[in-house]
């Protein structure tokens, strides 16, 4: 990313309050399940994952709006139950956003994590509509949801079949980007 001046990397977490938080580290899954929230039902679905606070990692938390990003129209969020806090810290960003791809839950996988209905309700305030949800498995209570701004709804009809095929694949991000912004170089 060093050669691309359009990409900036910040070594912080995102949330709704600027402070420092300690992370519950996942020791067995390449840290994919690490979270600022204490694991709850997550342990029922992945009993092999061990979480610890013994190896404490304190992470500085910033609000997305603190970065004053004005030229992005897509937001992707997968932060292990902290999704609603990231959204609340990015309300100004969300107002200018066209699409949000976010991990959602049907159960409380981490203590205090939002239910998909909480995400729906919050994003409705910004005129977003959930247009696609892909659960990992019928028996697994998490997945990914795609939200589009209400004024993009006519666009949905043309893409609805395509989204069903692309969501949860590595091609989805490129697919969305190619429809919403002009990509000059291959990713």
Model-derived segments and their meaning:
Residues 1-187:
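Phosphate/nucleotide-binding beta-alpha loop and adjacent structural elements of enzyme active sites
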